[in-house]
Amino acid sequence: MKNYLSIILITCSTTFLLSQTRFSNQDVFEIQYVKDPQIAPNNSQIVYVRTSMDIMTDSKTSSLWKISGDGTEHQKLTSSTANESSPRWSPDGKKIAFVSSTDDENGSEIYIYWVESKQYSSISQLKQSPKNIRWSPDGKYIGFTMFVEDDVLKLVSPPQKPDNATWAPAPRITDRLKHEADGSGYMEKGFHHLFMISSEGGTPIQVSSESYNHQSFDWSKDSKKMIFTSNYSENWEYEFRNSEIYSIKVDGSDLKQLTDRNGPDRGPVVSPDGRTIAYLGYLDKVQTYQVTKLYMMNIDGSNKREIKTNLDRSISSLRWAPDGKGVYFKYDNHGNGKIGYTSLSGKTKKIADNLGGTSIGRPYGGGSYSMSKTGKIVYTLSTPYHPADIGIFDGRKVQRITNLNFDLLSNRDLGTVEDIWYTSSVDGRKIQGWIAKPPEFDKNKKYPLIVENHGGPISNYGDRFSPEILLYSASD
């Protein structure tokens, strides 16, 4: 009986290997991946954005899903078919705020999902789509940024257009230096402002009023102020790298500038005790690439200091440790996304590898993570052989709890991706690269070679899942 069983197992295994096919462009429409995983304050559940491809519209779709920390109870959060994003747990863990698209073109609203009743409802009626939603510490408000249009410039008054007439589009007139952008085209005239809305619903309140773009922000511990990034310089259009950190009361008063130097100061996060602001930045030396460093200051802007991590890598996405004794962050090292931690004295350590998998196409970096009140971390975990799934770090080890593409990728031979280093013939510098070998690679055969040069560390490539690279290596 044992011999028969062995024959059956070997036969099944061989059949499985033979049934694997190469990755194709049609497979791109079957890919799904995790974005923006958010763990509940008490570790009970994780909510994340599940991104899929719609072959009928040639576009991406996104919906919210929830899963327990052990990988069970994996199910869609709502019954909506709209695009959903930006899930954020309330401080008490009883609600989830999120953004959902509406019937209006490119429009979206803020929704609340009540965890106990499993009901959800829109709480806003906004003129534009909200971004960067964030709960106030007392749970009473949700802060966000939103674009506010300026009046359209007019050089002349056009003649009266007859009813049902078909005329050419009106001319676009701008007085802005930056009026177009790659990927988005013409930019409407206006600025992004800070807003807040009651978590019970109501009229949104515009907090900022200055005619500048307001970006990343955090709340003060008492929920009475917003700490945010902007550039209030008269020459803000020409100082495209420069930004400062400001504070403002939620009623729009008591605006204060907390930083003042030539360079970007951004990404403020307030410590658990409310006394310290951690932020990112560097002194601009007008170079193509400059290392983004970690800084801290008192809540009033005093006692600014750099936390010297000796990492020699740019960092991003700061998160305070629950005990306030250190800060977590993202960084890239040799083409691999990492989560790191530093104490307030600058003692740094790596927490997790393989952060990324959310930039489907080329092997760019990216990814995100979140943390519970007990310090458990969830993040987008990826390798060259699968896009982002959910990884959990419990303080000891990393565990992958989803496998969204098992049905597809287990039946595909993706070849192999290997790290290579070589020496520059110009200056002897060590240069890193990766070679993607085709399925069923035979070292005794010759293959055509595609070389794609790409710089770093700006938008670096790495050992990440990339349909573009897979399709190259799978081609005959």
Segments from the language model and where they lie:
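Bacterial Sec-dependent N-terminal signal peptides
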Residues: 1-23
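Beta-strand-rich domains and repeat architectures in extracellular enzymes and scaffolds
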Residues: 26-62
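Predominantly five- to eight-bladed beta-propeller fold
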Residues: 61-62, 147-195, 229, 240-244, ...
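A short loop-to-beta-strand structural motif that recurs across blades of beta-propeller domains
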Residues: 63-65, 109-111, 193-195, 244-246, ...
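Short loop/turn segments that connect beta-strands within beta-propeller blades
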Residues: 68-72, 114-118, 198-202, 249-253, ...
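Serine-hydrolase catalytic core recognition
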Residues: 364-476
